[in-house]
């Protein structure tokens, strides 16, 4: 039903206060019922106080009241110059890596008190942003580049979005290729120093469509690697490819759930 929220209804609370109060309430209720809780958030709030304040979404604080947080880090949604990238839409791999590096920093600080923080399952772009002056066509190659960036940044899960629901399946893997990639990722991460693993039941690269295609709604594609690496288990701010270049011998892993301080 229609509702009007007037200034007097806020009782002095900010947008952030209202959002976090609600999230804390619903997280306790839903978890008590044995349910997992997730939320989609704007990607721009991760490293921008201006964007965070304007919509009331504070990334690290919201992550304390969720099991999964899904930042919408579509390269097309970043303005020219973001993360030092002239035209983010034209460099999907670099843009996703930059956004997830900032995500890791924010969640590192959010978890310094030893409390819970959500696992990260980012939204990736599977559409062409033709409204941008500086854009490129998105197809299987660009989808794969973004997925590779997720894995290289130490995360395992992702979602694809296309409002037209015309997904580029050639950017995804067959079960056989996904198994091979999972083994490669696990072997590569095992070479990294100070990395902790939380083994889970192996999963596959995405070949499934989530519910939500009813009544004209668009469906979303989701997937994850099968290594079970969790938030806080990868050297912060360090892409897999970069870490492999400097890694010599595996060091002593920290306790599960800990992480290194973020790099500059």
Which positions does each model-derived feature cover?
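Ligand-binding clefts of soluble mixed alpha/beta catalytic domains
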Residues: 194, 201
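Long, low-complexity, intrinsically disordered segments
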Residues: 207, 211-264
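Polar/charged alpha-helical tracts
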Residues: 32, 171, 180-190, 212, ...
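Substrate-binding cleft of secreted/luminal carbohydrate-active enzymes
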Residues: 66-77, 97, 102, 106-193
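Glycoside hydrolase catalytic-domain groove-lining segments
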Residues: 6-41, 46-49, 53-130
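Active-site groove signature of glycoside hydrolases
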Residues: 1-4
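Surface-exposed charge patches in extracellular/virion surface proteins
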Residues: 26-28, 197, 224, 238
